[in-house]
Amino acid sequence: MSYKIKDLSLASEGKKQIEWAERHMPTLMEIRKRFKAEKPLKGINISAVLHVTKETAALVKTLKIGGANVALAGSNPLSTQDDVAAALVEEGISVFAWKGENETEYYSNIESIVKIHEPNIVMDDGADLHAYIHEKVSSKLDIYGGTEETTTGVIRLKAMEKDGVLKYPLVAVNNAYTKYLFDNRYGTGQSAIDGILRATNILIAGKIAVVAGYGWVGRGIANRLRGMGARVIVTEVDPIRALEAVMDGFDVMPIAEASKVGDIFVTATGNTKAIRVEHMLNMKDGAILSNAGHFNVEVDVKGLKETAVKVRNIRPYVDEYTLPNGKRVYLLADGRLVNLAAAEGHPSEVMDMSFANQALAVEYLVKNRGKLEKKVYNMPMELDYEVARIKLKSMGIQIDELTEEQKEYLEQWKSGT
């Protein structure tokens, strides 16, 4: 079995971390029980680019128990948990990932998991693997379909669909209600702040926090910052989301204005250069810059490095940049995902639903091989509901069901006032 990780001797510690995650992922464990009995993925080759965390390990083990052969690479150069990677190798998973990869190593690892076995299913977090297969792989692969975990990745895949270049059907796992309403909002909302606190150990209360973007990630971060005592400003380009932020009680203004008053900045736009050098030059001395979007393009790190007259590392994941005007700004985790680079990512309880969706999406693609068009599909609602039902059951919560009379009422149109 091929693999490339940092240190196989870390496996015993990684196993304990995975056990801890699995204990808090009852939805995925329920699906694992069925997969173990039915083997719906028997003989299927899966190549996956995902954050190599203890929660991802629980998913990958579930796929293997379901009969799949899995090769895994990390979806961010700084997010891999090396002990977890080692534990997965001991479980028979081909892992090509370690914390601190450079760009060449990152893409080499993606190449390796395609070459190690020609995938039937492609799983991705950010669409780098999908893009690699479409741009770099000339051989004809027998790919049944793929999945995508993130908003950023779905945007890329939708662009590929629009250009007519998709080679296989995709399921946008990110678009499942049981994913984005919980993972994006509660997961990132908590874990991004966890990353900021681990990196800086600052007090949130009393600070002015600027959140760029008010999608599900942005609103989760904004609400949790407010809950910890920050005064929160939201910046947006979408008038509807900006209006939502106002109605939710946040101040809304352009980033050019917010940059003058903010103490902490968090980007969550899914777009490039939400914070540019022109904004950094306006910031207070000591402003903190962080990113909660998938790629390290939301803060103009390249421009910052070119502009700064002095750079020094202050703490792990904290770099101080002195600007030409003498002010200093502090960039966390080199502008990469602060929740995964400086902390451990989302809590297991929320990844339970996200990865339950991933497992069911893979099964769906295998069952529907050859029946789907080469386009991006939303997660089938019946699977979304299945995840919600299992999760509620695991929490000891019961809900009502529609009576026959209520079902009939909803299906007719003649009854009115």
From Swiss-Prot:
One of its GO terms (molecular function) is adenosylhomocysteinase activity. Pathway: Amino-acid biosynthesis; L-homocysteine biosynthesis; L-homocysteine from S-adenosyl-L-homocysteine: step 1/1. It comes from the Archaea. Transmembrane segments: none annotated. CDD domains: SAHH. It holds the Pfam family AdoHcyase_NAD. GO terms for cellular component: cytosol. May play a key role in the regulation of the intracellular concentration of adenosylhomocysteine. Belongs to the adenosylhomocysteinase family. This is Adenosylhomocysteinase. It comes from Saccharolobus solfataricus (strain ATCC 35092 / DSM 1617 / JCM 11322 / P2) (Sulfolobus solfataricus).
